[in-house]
Amino acid sequence: MNDTVKKPTGGRGDDPLPAGAALSAVAPHEPVSVVLAGGGTAGHVEPAMAVADALKALDPNVRITSLGTARGLETRLVPERGYDLELITPVPLPRKPTGDLARLPSRVWRAVRETRAVLHAVDADVVIGFGGYVALPAYLAARGVSPRKPRVPVVIHEANASAGLANRVGARTAQRVLSAVADCGLPGAEVVGVPVREAITSLDRAAVRAEARRHFGFADDARVLLVFGGSQGAASLNRAVSGAAAQLAAAGVSVLHAHGPKNTLDLREPQPGDPPYVAVPYLDRMDLAYAAADLVICRSGAMTVAEVSAVGLPAIYVPLPIGNGEQRLNALPVVNAGGGMVVADADLTPELVAREVAGLVGDPPRLAAMTTAAARVGHPDAARRVAQAALDIGRTARRARGATGGRP
C-alpha cells in the first residue's frame, strides 16, 4: 500500500495507453486489482475505506486504488488509511435523472476519460461503486464504448434508503447490486447493510466504557449524552442541545458535544457541582465517544445510522431537512425496531431535548431494550460481504482475461 495522491490526468494515466489500446496478456494468478469509487462526503468515503480494509483482510495481496476529486474528504481520509488515491475531475450531478446520458455536462465525459486511463493503468479487474459524483464516471468508464475498449465488471453498494442518480445509472449494467436496506429503488439489490470499519463493529462498549469516560473527563457512573451532526456539525442540533444545558445539568446528564470545526456554542457558565459539558470541534476517536455514551442525538445519514446501530447505541435521530427525505428513511428501520426515535429538525427545541433526554437516561430498562433493538438492526459483516463479492467477481474476470490473452 502507499499513500500517493495523484492529480487528474486528462485521460492519460501514469502508464498511459492510446484510447482503445488492448492490454497485453494477463497472468491469471496475479493479485486482483480493485478500484473503489466513493468520494466527496464521509458517507461515501467511509464505506469505501471499510471495504478496503475488508479486502485486505480477505486477501492481503489485493491491489486497491481509490478514485476521488481534489475537493472531497478523500484527499485526507484515503491517504490516512494507507491507500492509493487517483484524482479525477469533479462533476455536478442532478438529484434525479434528467434524460439521455449524452446530455450530461462535458465535465462528466472528461472525468470518464480520466477514469478509463486509471482503469488501464492499474489493470483493474473490478470496480466497487458507492454512489455520488465520483462513482458515475467510474460506472461509465467501466462499461467501455466499443469492443476495443475495456469493460470492467462493477459491484454497486447503495447506502441510502433511496438510491441516487449515479447508482441508478450504474445498476443497469452492474454484476452485483448490494444495498443497506430493502426497497432502495435498485431492482435486484441484495441487502447487506452499510460497510462499517472494524474498530466500530468490534467495539465492546461495556468493556471500554470506563476507559472512554476517563478519556473525556466523565465519572465512571455518569449518564452521558453524545451529540454530533456529521463532520461539519449541525447548527440546529447545536442550538437545541446547548440551549438545554441547564436542564440537562439539573437532570444529572453529562454531555459530549462535537459542534463542528466552523461552529461555536453559546454555553452558560456552569454551576458548582454541574456534570461536565464537554464541547469539542471534532471527535477523532468515535469509538471512545460511542463507548462513553448512553444516548446520542445525531443526524441520520446512512453511515451515521449504520455506526450507531452497529454499536447498539440508543439514538434520537434528527434527519437533515433537505433532499428527498432519505435521511428520515435511513433511520426508520432502527426506529421501527425500537432502537431510537425520530424528531423533525423543525421540532428540535431545548425543551424537547431536556424532556426526552432526561426521560430516557432516567429509565435504564428502556435504554437497555433500545440498545438490544438497535444492535439487532446492525449488519457488522457488511464490509466483508461487499469485499467478498468484489473479490469473487474480480478473480473470475482475471481468470477469463488470462485465458483469452486480454480483455474480453
Swiss-Prot record:
PANTHER family: GLYCOSYLTRANSFERASE, UDP-N-ACETYLGLUCOSAMINE--N-ACETYLMURAMYL-(PENTAPEPTIDE) PYROPHOSPHORYL-UNDECAPRENOL N-ACETYLGLUCOSAMINE TRANSFERASE 1
Molecular function via GO: UDP-N-acetyl-D-glucosamine:N-acetylmuramoyl-L-alanyl-D-glutamyl-meso-2,6-diaminopimelyl-D-alanyl-D-alanine-diphosphoundecaprenol 4-beta-N-acetylglucosaminlytransferase activity; undecaprenyldiphospho-muramoylpentapeptide beta-N-acetylglucosaminyltransferase activity
InterPro entries: GlcNAc_MurG, Glyco_trans_28_C, GlycoTrans_28_N
Keywords from the named record: Cell cycle, Cell division, Cell membrane, Cell shape, Cell wall biogenesis/degradation, Glycosyltransferase, Membrane, Peptidoglycan synthesis, Transferase
Annotated EC: 2.4.1.227
Residues that hold UDP-N-acetyl-alpha-D-glucosamine according to the record: 41-43, 160, 197, 231, 327
NCBIfam families linked to this entry: murG (TIGR01133)
Record bears the keyword tRNA processing: no
Protein name per the record: UDP-N-acetylglucosamine--N-acetylmuramyl-(pentapeptide) pyrophosphoryl-undecaprenol N-acetylglucosamine transferase
Family named by the database record: Belongs to the glycosyltransferase 28 family. MurG subfamily.
Reactions performed catalytically: di-trans,octa-cis-undecaprenyl diphospho-N-acetyl-alpha-D-muramoyl-L-alanyl-D-glutamyl-meso-2,6-diaminopimeloyl-D-alanyl-D-alanine + UDP-N-acetyl-alpha-D-glucosamine = di-trans,octa-cis-undecaprenyl diphospho-[N-acetyl-alpha-D-glucosaminyl-(1->4)]-N-acetyl-alpha-D-muramoyl-L-alanyl-D-glutamyl-meso-2,6-diaminopimeloyl-D-alanyl-D-alanine + UDP + H(+)
First-tier enzyme category under EC: transferase
Protein encoded by which gene: murG
Membrane topology according to the record: Peripheral membrane protein
Domain of life: Bacteria
A cellular component term, taken from the record's GO annotations: plasma membrane
CDD domains named among the record's database cross-references: GT28_MurG
Functional summary from the UniProt entry: Cell wall formation. Catalyzes the transfer of a GlcNAc subunit on undecaprenyl-pyrophosphoryl-MurNAc-pentapeptide (lipid intermediate I) to form undecaprenyl-pyrophosphoryl-MurNAc-(pentapeptide)GlcNAc (lipid intermediate II).
Region feature (Disordered): 1-20
